[in-house]
């Protein structure tokens, strides 16, 4: 809504709501992944699901996720308008988007086999058959993703942050219930060939059912907020519709380029045994804290960026951009230190049970470490993209993403043979680093200077502190293994907690000595939250 109509909630309050709600969702997501890992390990069923989920899952994250282009476009436009203008605008955009995505759903159902063959030409016949069936079951998520993304955007614009952040747990609950009952009844038999089809259908069906529940959960709150009801509206001449599409279409295409990169990664991964499953498990562990923190940073900052788009407000906009980048570094770098230094014990704690054995843990751990190295570049890129959206420019991110397709393919080709699965992940890290660098250069020119010398100096200090903290945790873990070994889950958990604490202490002392201004800002926010609790 317009600034005058918005709630007076502070950035810290919004970030706190989003963080707590997202944390709850991520806990359920972690439980879902643990059940999947215990039931199927890194074998045939999970590999098939990893490929079948690529298109519907990507659409669900891209279009239906918080901070996606649909969410960002709606927030950017509605935050500048009065509430009475919202309902017809939202209903019109929903009608238009639903028509397009219904067609996409039909295409996915009819062409499932073709899409799987394009994504993974190296799959075994049985794995391919399961992947095709799973894709057909999950195809409706294409339509649901658009409806959910629009709903999230409208609820955020109405100053409602809890439901959009917590509703993803519904997608986890349905999978947990379905697989949980199957594991309870069948045990390890579920991962034997006679039950592979049942397991794959439970995975796909539970995922789709969760998406349906997620959409249904937002309909009533959206209507009560006066942000549109479930009705068709064809008033495409509304001025706001054009404004939304001017941001939404380039942003969707730009983000869609990431899908092409992801599909390219999986194309090369199909020639490496168990690579897709290893990437799925490693990616989830990295994305769990990343998702929580990215929502804390991106959700409250996007409306702020939008309200500072006028040239006379650019001095404050540049300050906010720096804050977004530095807060990303201060929150991501300690996680990078932990995931890189403690990759093996972390994977053992989270996944090593049932069908997921020590050999599977050894496959996933280096992949997790590689994802950990790229966390800051992923989040920093997203912060900068939101600045372009706030400025009404979806074309610049699109052009960069278009070039990144070729860069990602080249890096995948160069890295996948010598480095295996880790090489594919590092190709993605390289692409995100390149994107972030280009976006900073473009904004520096567009906003007449960003004081990049100061940025580089402070980021350099934080990188050094991160390296020292990670080495401290890694060496501490090696010493722990020599002195006590690890003979149980409890001992493994104690090792991870102890070494993570050492890493955080070293990092905290290091950043305090580095005297980065945003350290005090982050500390003040955390202290205020602690006092409220």
UniProtKB/Swiss-Prot annotation:
Pathway: Cell wall biogenesis; peptidoglycan biosynthesis. GO terms for biological process: cell wall organization; peptidoglycan biosynthetic process; regulation of cell shape. It is found in: Cell inner membrane. The chain crosses the membrane at residues 11-31, 39-61, 96-116, 135-155, 166-186, 196-216, 253-273, 284-304, 330-350, 360-380, 400-420, 422-442, 452-472, 493-513. The keyword Transmembrane helix applies. Keywords: Cell inner membrane, Cell membrane, Cell shape, Cell wall biogenesis/degradation, Membrane, Peptidoglycan synthesis, Transmembrane, Transmembrane helix, Transport. It holds the Pfam family MurJ. GO terms for cellular component: plasma membrane. GO terms for molecular function: lipid-linked peptidoglycan transporter activity. Its main location: membrane. It is a multi-pass membrane protein. HAMAP family: MurJ_MviN. PANTHER family: LIPID II FLIPPASE MURJ-RELATED. Belongs to the MurJ/MviN family. Involved in peptidoglycan biosynthesis. Transports lipid-linked peptidoglycan precursors from the inner to the outer leaflet of the cytoplasmic membrane. This is Probable lipid II flippase MurJ. It comes from Synechocystis sp. (strain ATCC 27184 / PCC 6803 / Kazusa).
């Amino acid at each position: 809504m317009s600034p005058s109509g918005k709630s007076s909630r502070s950035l810290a309050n919004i970030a706190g709501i989003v963080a707590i709600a997202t944390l709850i969702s991520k806990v359920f997501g972690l439980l879902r992944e643990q059940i999947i890992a215990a039931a199927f390990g890194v074998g045939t069923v999970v590999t098939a699901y990893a490929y079948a989920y690529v298109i519907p899952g990507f659409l669900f994250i891209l279009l239906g996720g918080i901070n996606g282009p649909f969410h960002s476009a709606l927030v950017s436009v509605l935050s500048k308008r009065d509430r009475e203008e919202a309902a017809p605008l939202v209903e019109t955009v929903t009608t238009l988007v639903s028509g397009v995505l219904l067609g996409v759903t039909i295409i996915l159902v009819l062409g499932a086999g073709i899409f799987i063959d394009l994504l993974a030409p190296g799959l075994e016949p049985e794995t391919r058959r399961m992947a095709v069936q799973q894709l057909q079951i999950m195809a409706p998520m294409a339509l649901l993703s658009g409806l959910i993304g629009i709903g999230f955007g409208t609820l955020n614009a109405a100053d409602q942050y809890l439901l959009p952040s917590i509703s993803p747990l519904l997608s986890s609950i349905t999978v947990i219930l379905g697989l949980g009952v199957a594991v309870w009844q069948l045990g390890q038999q579920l991962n034997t060939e006679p039950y592979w089809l049942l397991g794959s259908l439970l995975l796909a069906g539970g995922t789709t059912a969760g998406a349906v529940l997620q959409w249904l959960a937002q309909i009533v709150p959206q209507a009560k907020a006066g942000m549109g009801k479930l009705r068709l509206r064809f008033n495409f001449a509304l001025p706001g519709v054009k404004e939304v599409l001017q941001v939404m279409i380039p942003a969707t295409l730009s983000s869609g380029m990431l899908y092409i990169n992801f599909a390219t990664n999986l194309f090369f991964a199909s020639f490496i045994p168990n690579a897709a499953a290893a990437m799925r498990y490693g990616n989830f562990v990295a994305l769990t804290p990343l998702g929580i923190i990215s929502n804390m940073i991106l959700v409250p900052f996007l409306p702020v960026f939008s309200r500072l788009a006028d040239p006379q407000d650019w001095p404050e906009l540049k300050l906010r951009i720096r804050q977004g980048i530095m807060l990303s570094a201060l929150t991501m770098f300690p996680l990078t230190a932990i995931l890189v230094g403690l990759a093996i014990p972390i994977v053992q704690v989270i996944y090593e049970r049932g069908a997921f054995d020590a050999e599977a843990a050894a496959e996933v751990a280096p992949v997790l470490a590689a994802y950990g190295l790229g966390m800051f570049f992923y989040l920093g890129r997203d912060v900068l993209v939101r600045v372009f959206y706030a400025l009404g420019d979806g074309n610049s991110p699109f052009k960069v993403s278009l070039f990144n397709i070729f860069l990602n393919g080249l890096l995948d080709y160069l890295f996948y043979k010598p480095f295996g699965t880790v090489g594919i992940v590092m190709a993605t890290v390289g692409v995100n680093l390149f994107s972030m660098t280009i976006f900073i250069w473009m904004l520096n020119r567009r906003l007449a200077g960003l004081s990049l010398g100061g940025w580089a100096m402070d980021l350099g200090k934080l990188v050094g502190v991160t390296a020292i903290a990670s080495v401290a945790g890694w060496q501490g873990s090696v010493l722990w293994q020599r002195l006590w070994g690890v003979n149980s889950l409890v001992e493994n958990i104690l090792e991870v907690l102890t070494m993570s604490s050492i890493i955080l202490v070293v990092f905290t002392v290091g950043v305090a000595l580095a005297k980065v201004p945003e350290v005090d800002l982050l500390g003040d926010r955390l202290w205020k939250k602690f006092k409220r609790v």
